[in-house]
């Protein structure tokens, strides 16, 4: 039997149990003990305001429930950090405008190294890095030069190997099987009509292109084997007043099926059965540009192949204003949503004021004491993990 890869399942292995200040059970029963992987906190990558050098990282600690605002300014993450990937004690942060991958120490959030993508790949190939993931000892990232670059996670050096993909690549993910891993890349073409998915067979370096008229502007992608779940931003009306056909789509064996209408944000968690990862829990928000409707939220279980509405409750006075990022704690299953703040002068969402984030259970109930401020324009949410010993 082939062992199919779940692209995000490689980040966290182990039990779904979490012990922390926001846990439901703090008891110590004594007796035997075992080690489990737990979520120690979460970080938010904040774009900042373009041209203002105020991109930053916000860290929320699960134990203390305290927040730190980190790495802001030109000496930090600079202008427009866009994505991040955690591997062990290291966070790799993508600096799009800076043409840099920032290597950050997870323990003290100091910058260990700045890796220039244009120096490592070439001016034309390495400009504007966008998204990042990892597999084995390699860190993979996309660039608007139309390439996927590779960093050695141990030596923190740029590989000479790079893969030519489609136009304006965004998110990427690892799928296939353990014996034949495949890197899938979402090529957006900036929404101009020539979008595609690149399929890179890592053992040979062969690059194939997948095209379908329903794939118009793919932004994020996750895989179970060779089954793909694609967040697509669709297209805009001629006057750019409205966004149309955005959504979460399922691709397999040449067929594209819509799953969540109007979805514009995606977070990826795990589905567990008997402490075994069996699929994804995909959290989405639907807030297409120009829509007069309030944002909606959904969960999609890839194991049961079912969609559930996520109705947010219990957050009176700190309701989500304009969702900007969503994530699922892969161990506990809580949903984290980052939002823009409301401008007190205009009453509209602000792109220049600090945002905020809330945590909710998978049934949509606000988790007490988890409302915290972020930097300007929160864009991506990641998690940090540690190992704990529990007694029972």
Question: Residue locations for each model-derived region?
Answer:
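Intrinsically disordered, low-complexity segments enriched in Gly and acidic/Ser/Thr residues
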Residues: 258-353, 359
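Repeated scaffold domains used in trafficking and secretory/extracellular systems
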Residues: 78-86, 123-134, 167-176, 214-225, ...
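Acidic, serine/threonine- and glycine-rich low-complexity intrinsically disordered segments
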Residues: 157-292
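Short coil/turn segments that connect the beta-strands within blades of beta-propeller domains
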Residues: 38-42, 88-90, 136-138, 179-181, ...
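A short beta-strand motif characteristic of beta-propeller blades
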Residues: 65-76, 110-123, 157-163, 205-212, ...
